[in-house]
From Swiss-Prot:
Lineage of producing organism: Bacteria, Pseudomonadati, Pseudomonadota, Gammaproteobacteria, Enterobacterales
Protein name (database record): Protein PsiE
Cytoplasmic compartment spans: 1-14, 76-81, 129-136
InterPro entries: P_starv_induced_PsiE, P_starv_induced_PsiE-like
Induction annotation: Positively regulated by PhoB and negatively regulated by the cyclic AMP-cAMP receptor protein (cAMP-CRP) complex.
Periplasmic side: 36-54, 103-107
Membrane topology category: Multi-pass membrane protein
A single Gene Ontology CC term: plasma membrane
Keywords: Cell inner membrane, Cell membrane, Membrane, Transmembrane, Transmembrane helix
GO biological process: cellular response to phosphate starvation
Pfam families, per database record: PsiE
Location in or out of the cell: Cell inner membrane
Length: 136
């Protein structure tokens, strides 16, 4: 079996990087559309007189922040030279678990487990922002 030459490997790498960039660009545009739809939905819920609309509003706000964080992650990917910073994934994980607690808070044990997961993610975030692991 022959090994690939260096120029061929670089060409394949460039093609794959371009496909990845185009895919992330499309995903970013789709997320912007969803962010716009969520904005309209939040405006509708804000002016709804029902009591349940308050819970919908809080849940919608957290979903809004999730869209926002994913878009920020894609922007940061392009700004940092095609690299995903780990801390952005941790932010998204914390926000997603907070949303889960807001939506599904019937079982106290589940809420405790979710809270422990958030604590673990916050510790991870602290470690990622420490001087030894800080890259930016």
């Amino acid at each position: 079996m022959t090994s690939l030459s260096r120029p061929r490997v670089e060409f394949i790498s460039t093609i794959l990087q371009t496909v990845l960039n185009l895919g992330l660009l499309c995903l970013g545009l789709i997320l912007v559309v969803f962010l716009g739809k969520e904005t309209v939905h939040l405006a509708d819920v804000l002016f709804a007189p029902e009591q349940t609309s308050k819970y919908e509003l809080v849940e919608g706000l957290v979903v809004y922040f999730l869209y926002f964080e994913f878009i920020a992650l894609i922007v940061k990917y392009f700004q940092s030279g095609f690299h995903f910073p780990l801390r952005y994934f941790v932010y998204i994980g914390i926000t997603a678990i907070v949303r889960l607690i807001i939506v599904d808070h019937k079982s106290p044990l589940d809420v405790l487990i979710y809270s422990a997961a958030i604590l673990l993610l916050v510790i991870t975030l602290w470690l990622c922002n420490s001087k030894r692991l800080k890259r930016e």
